[in-house]
């Protein structure tokens, strides 16, 4: 599902201009990380993708749908949004009901809903927790319930808002596994993140925002190697990227595998 953002401007009530002429194209199946300081426009931008916000001017197309002309409930069939705080998203009495709500609300058959729920629970390692109230689970597991409730809707585009915030190392690994599996399935995955190492290890394209505009946009290695430009939006390159630069490696590296390979050259 292609995303086309054309000259997008957005001004909040009170006159705060949050987005200033953003144009981006995201192809089906891309894995894109949005980075930048607080207030750079990341969350405002992605909330235009599922219709939670409407452009002041410009347009956002999700496939052939103009978000200004399509209801939020209908857009949910194409764009799934996992909130930063799962407690803002969860409301059902047990995990199974929570994860089934989305596909049922989209009008899927009972058979398809059951299959999607089973798959989402397995992918997020929640199969043994279907009868548990989400609020009896730890925050890390509630995050997985929130992920599962979006995955079960089988939308072509999945947005993660700060997925690793408040998560331990094991939970971050689970989330990375989910991202990798969604990529394998051909889904478009977009994340907003301050976790630059998670971004570097799991996303192929990075868009850096500053003051409501695109500062950098390109392959992760190219963007994350531009420390001086990233500093304008208070983003530091990953630790291994910085180490590689200090060692004088010819290539920009973003993970352990690339770092070790570059050392051998």
Predicted regions, residues:
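A short, flexible loop at the N-terminus of ABC-type nucleotide-binding domains that lies
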Residues: 1-2, 9-21, 69-71
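The feature captures the beta-strand-to-loop junction immediately N-terminal to the Walker
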Residues: 35-37
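Helix-to-loop junction immediately C-terminal to a conserved catalytic motif
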Residues: 50
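Conserved ABC ATPase "signature" region
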Residues: 111-129
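Catalytic Walker B motif of ABC-type/P-loop ATPase nucleotide-binding domains
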Residues: 158-161
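H-loop/switch region of ABC-family ATPase nucleotide-binding domains
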Residues: 193-194
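Conserved ABC ATPase "signature" C-loop
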Residues: 211-212
């Amino acid at each position: 599902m292609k995303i086309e953002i054309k000259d997008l401007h957005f001004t909040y009530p009170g006159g705060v201009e949050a987005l200033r002429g953003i144009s981006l194209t995201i192809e089906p199946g891309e894995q894109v990380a949005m980075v930048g300081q607080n207030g750079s426009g990341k969350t405002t931008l992605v909330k235009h993708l599922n219709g939670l916000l409407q452009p002041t001017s410009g347009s956002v197309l999700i496939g052939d749908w103009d978000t200004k002309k399509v209801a939020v409930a209908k857009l949910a069939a194409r764009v799934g949004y996992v909130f930063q705080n799962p407690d803002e998203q969860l409301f059902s009495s047990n995990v199974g009901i929570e994860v089934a709500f989305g596909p049922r609300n989209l009008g899927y058959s009972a058979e398809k809903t059951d299959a999607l729920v089973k798959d989402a629970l397995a992918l997020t390692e929640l199969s043994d927790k279907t009868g548990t109230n989400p609020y009896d689970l730890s925050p890390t597991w509630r995050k997985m319930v929130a992920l599962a409730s979006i995955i079960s809707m089988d939308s072509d585009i999945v947005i993660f808002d700060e997925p690793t915030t408040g998560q331990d190392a094991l939970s971050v690994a689970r989330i990375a596994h989910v991202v990798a599996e969604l990529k394998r399935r051909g889904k478009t995955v977009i994340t907003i993140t301050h976790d630059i190492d998670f971004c570097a290890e799991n996303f192929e394209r990075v868009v850096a925002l500053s003051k409501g505009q695109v500062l950098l946009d390109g392959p992760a290695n190219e963007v994350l190697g531009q420390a001086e430009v990233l500093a304008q939006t208070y983003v530091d390159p990953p630790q291994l990227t910085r180490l590689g630069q200090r060692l004088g490696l010819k290539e920009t590296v973003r993970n352990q595998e690339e770092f070790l390979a570059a050392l051998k050259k």
